[in-house]
Amino acid sequence: MDDQSRMLQTLAGVNLAGHSVQGGMALPPPPHGHEGADGDGRKQDIGDILHQIMTITDQSLDEAQAKKHALNCHRMKPALFSVLCEIKEKTGLSIRGAQEEDPPDPQLMRLDNMLLAEGVSGPEKGGGSAAAAAAAAASGGSSDNSIEHSDYRAKLTQIRQIYHTELEKYEQACNEFTTHVMNLLREQSRTRPISPKEIERMVGIIHRKFSSIQMQLKQSTCEAVMILRSRFLDARRKRRNFSKQATEILNEYFYSHLSNPYPSEEAKEELAKKCSITVSQVSNWFGNKRIRYKKNIGKFQEEANLYAAKTAVTAAHAVAAAVQNNQTNSPTTPNSGSSGSFNLPNSGDMFMNMQSLNGDSYQGSQVGANVQSQVDTLRHVINQTGGYSDGLGGNSLYSPHNLNANGGWQDATTPSSVTSPTEGPGSVHSDTSN
């Protein structure tokens, strides 16, 4: 009790600088030469107060409660409280000008909107899962896409669970700390003046401090969602090479229509069905193929010759089958009064730089040895099977198609059919009608 009395008297009569207080005004210290026993006593009292403050942390809970009870029951306690109110009234003027409420953080609002749009925060109503399903439907709903988007939904659900678990921990820690501070301030309000409004202001400060943790959590969650989207739903991820069969079909159409490699909408739909791809993918493939062909014609000439020889062999087999079928069905040899016509499949507008079917040369770049051997074999098969004379080489079955000087495609005349002229009963010549 004596210690508490001496503490209150010291706080009421002495400030921290050692100046005496009288009527709320600090008096100048006496000259150094006139300091007496009172000055030494004040220094000793201040030293005792500082020592008690430093030993507060070493006190037990029972000792702290006992000193608190003694302070509240002391007769000078109301005087001490009034002095503290005066001090707070003077120092509180600078605090009143401070802004009471801060505007919401725009970055935090953007993070909240993104998490809500992705279905991570708020009630689970699809969110990113619905986006994944829409992307799967747009890509054709193949099994690979379905598996990928099911994995996306599973990963998104996992991110959502982790986010909500960490958010609950954050809210629990924030509430516990806020409750502790509020109880502490209410307890201290018995000794020093603390208004309820000041307690609310302190709660707001605590929440703003904790909001940095919340922003970090939401930022990391948004980054995880963006990485997940770039891995599963990015358009560049959807780009895959076509199958070998689809590439063969598209290349065959391209080189067989090299004079005008712009398929119609009906042709695109037909090619899309054959290749099991979409019409837009067919359009993109032809656009890219035309650009690559124009940039490097020499490189693609060998490929064009390969497809030319391949399709020529197919056409020769069809001609041979048609001739054999005609000989089987018509026992008499056609004379000058009768003529038969045979339609070659894809005979018109077929290949670039191919001068003749059984001629001696190709125009354009040098044909490889394997292609030349196929041409020689083809010429031999046609001569042996159909009895064609060398007159076939005199006429050009495949017209060369060139690019314009400005890079455009130049159309060439398209042969329509191959007919047998009326010369003799023992020979059949080819003739192209434009």
Curated annotation (Swiss-Prot):
Domain of life: Eukaryota
Region (PBC-A): 48-127
Xref: Pfam families: Homeobox_KN, PBC
SUPFAM superfamilies to which the protein is assigned, alphabetical: Homeodomain-like (SSF46689)
InterPro entries in the cross-refs: HD, Homeobox_CS, Homeodomain-like_sf, KN_HD, PBX_PBC_dom, TALE_homeobox
Span list, region Disordered: 20-41, 326-349, 403-434
Domain PBC: from-to ranges: 41-234
Biased composition (Basic and acidic residues): 32-41
Gene Ontology CC entries for this record: chromatin; nucleus; transcription regulator complex
Keywords tagged on the record: Activator, DNA-binding, Homeobox, Nucleus, Transcription, Transcription regulation
Major localization listed first in the record, in broad terms: nucleus
Regions of compositional bias (Polar residues) in chain numbering: 403-422
Quaternary structure note: Interacts with PBXIP1.
Family in the record: Belongs to the TALE/PBX homeobox family.
Name of the protein: Pre-B-cell leukemia transcription factor 3
Organism the protein comes from: Homo sapiens (Human)
Gene: PBX3
